[in-house]
Amino acid sequence: MTPPFRWDLLLKVGGSLGRGAALAPLMQRIGLLAGRRRLLVVPGGGVFADLVRRQTARARVDEETAHHMALFAMDQFGLLLSSLSRRSTVVDNLQAAELVAEAGRVP
């Protein structure tokens, strides 16, 4: 049996960081850190989640649909984060994230 993968760091990058100028430098530093540590970046929802909140309230969307929309908002913010680091690779599952991290990149 394969031993479980061990992460060194799990970093949640909150969506509020997307409202200032610190996001690009932060992602560049995380990219450098990925060469030394196995890390996983989990995105918040940012302005994408804000839009989902407004639209679901306005349209009176049910909670399950609103939840799925919020998850897609996190995906959108994750794509933005990935675009800010040359050492980042977009992944959509844990196995892919492990492979990317083992290669010294940011999943």
Task: Label every PLM stretch briefly.
Residues M1-L40:
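N-terminal glycine-/serine-/threonine-rich phosphate-binding loop
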Residues G18-R19, V47-D50:
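Short, active-site-adjacent cap segments at secondary-structure transitions
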Residues A22-L23, V52-R54:
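Ubiquitous "structural anchor" signal
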Residues G44:
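Glycine-rich N-terminal segment of FAD-binding domains in flavoprotein oxidoreductases
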Residues R53-P107:
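Ligand-binding beta-strand-loop-alpha-helix segment within the catalytic cores
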